[in-house]
Structure formats: structure tokens, C-alpha cells
Amino acid sequence: MHNKIYSSDNPKKPVRTISGVTPLTVVLKPKKCDHGTCIYCPGGEYTPQSYTDKSPAIMRAMALDYDPYQQTKIRLENLHRMGHPTDKIELIILGGTFLQYPLDYQYDVIKRSFDALNGRIAKNLEEAKKWNETSEHRCVAMCIENRPD
């Protein structure tokens, strides 16, 4: 096996971004599900219920105290450093039942993720979305994990 030198012309794991859209994951802070604990959910005290602390995204989120701004900013920098395109981002929000979190927290997670993509802090989510239309790092897709339980 030989070592490769990774540069912006030779991204690590190019399959991840071959379509031109780069996935970026933000993890919600841990919260017990309103319906109780499912048999198949391994979660612990410091992780969202449906995840273990071994997942790279969870480890990054834990290290950043689940701050959506920091998760987005740091991951964006890392993806750029690895040579992935960062102009078109698919924002993936993980962590269980999104709709069971307070509405203010839901808006805050999305807004702060947009703030990091925009490189500046907006007054509200609407302003953050508007700025993102012309940002260097545009959110072109958003996937919010939600369990039907």
C-alpha cells in the first residue's frame, strides 16, 4: 500500500463529494425521547439516543459541546483542508426526534448552522437564509433526521 499526498486536487474519499455537493453533519444535543427508550437505541448519557459515542460525527459534536455553529464551522474547514468542494453543502441534522426538541432550539440549530456557512451572525433565521443565497458556502439541501415514534 502506498501513501497519497492529499491536496485540493486530490481529495480524501472523493466519492463523498463526486456529485459536487458536500454532506456536512450537525448533531443535536442529547435528549431522552418523549416516548421512552427503544430497545434498538444504544444511546447513552452523553450521546443522542439513537447513536453511540463511536461515530465520527458524534465524537466531533461531543468535543464541541454539541454547538451547531462550531460543528459546522470546524467541519467546513476540515472538508476544505481535505480538498472537498465547500461551495454547495447538504446540511444533515442528526440526533433523533428533531420535532421533540423545543421549537426555539430547532430554529437555533438551523440558524447557527447557516451563520457558520455564511461566516457572519444573522439576527434571525430568515436573514441567515437570505444571506446564504449568495454565500461562499451555500446550503443546497437539508436533511433533518426525525423518528416517527
Language-model regions, residue ranges each:
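N-terminal [4Fe-4S]-dependent radical SAM core
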Residues: 1-37, 45-68, 73, 77-79, ...
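Cys/His-coordinated zinc-binding microdomains
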Residues: 42
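Conserved SAM/AdoMet-binding glycine-rich loop
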Residues: 77-149
